[in-house]
Regions:
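Active-site microenvironments in enzyme catalytic cores
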Residues: 1-134, 185
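Catalytic-pocket segment enriched in acidic/His residues
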Residues: 87-200
């Protein structure tokens, strides 16, 4: 309890106010959910299920101390990730990990497109529909941090192994941000799409 209190004071000082640096966090993936598969509801545990369309970056080589200028050489390819999130668990535990890491919470696909086929990864349209209604519509040029910038920052003090997948964040339009908040219901069909990759 005492450590929780002192950590709380530190968190308020360290994480409050403006955020000049990118926020990174881990997401456990027991098994990626294939395109077309259902996402589990977890009745009784999850009451606010949400979607997040994101560009996924797959590394093809171990990366350590990589510069932003050279980071592109470490990218094998790209895919689409729907970063399914249980908002009530995020709120309850005051962090992202558990609410994003339940089994089945990482739909990924429908394929991997190699980096040479994508070209400029910072110029891709990204969208998400729920039951045909457009909820998210943006472009990767609006990302807070570039793909290469994220690889450079993350590899400063740790090795990113070949095969590492980086989800690069989601644009506005998630259910949590709607007024009133509108979360996923049983039977909803979510389609995440990214230019040059396809739809998940």
């Amino acid at each position: 309890d005492a450590h929780a209190q002192e950590a709380g004071r530190f968190s308020s000082e360290a994480f409050g106010g403006e955020r000049p640096y990118t926020i990174y966090f881990s997401k456990r993936v027991n098994r990626a959910t294939a395109s077309g598969e259902s996402v589990p509801r977890y009745e009784g545990l999850v009451d606010s299920l949400d979607y997040e369309a994101e560009l996924g970056v797959i590394l093809g080589r171990d990366a350590k101390g990589v510069s932003k200028e050279n980071a592109g050489a470490y990218i094998f390819g790209y895919t689409i990730i729907n970063d399914i999130s249980a908002r009530n668990l995020q709120t309850r535990h005051k962090q992202w990990y558990l609410g994003k890491s339940l089994d089945g919470f990482t739909p990924m696909g429908p394929c991997i497109v190699t980096a040479d086929e994508i070209g400029d990864e910072q110029a891709l349209d990204i969208s998400c529909t729920v039951n045909g209604e457009l909820r998210q519509s943006s472009n990767t040029r609006f990302m807070i941090q570039t793909v290469c910038g994220a690889i450079a920052e993350l590899s400063e003090g740790m090795t990113l192994a070949a095969g590492t997948i980086i989800a690069t964040g989601t644009p506005a339009g998630v259910g949590l941000g709607m007024k009133p908040p509108t979360f996923l219901q049983h039977g909803d069909k979510i389609v995440c799409s990214i230019e040059k990759i396809g739809s998940l």
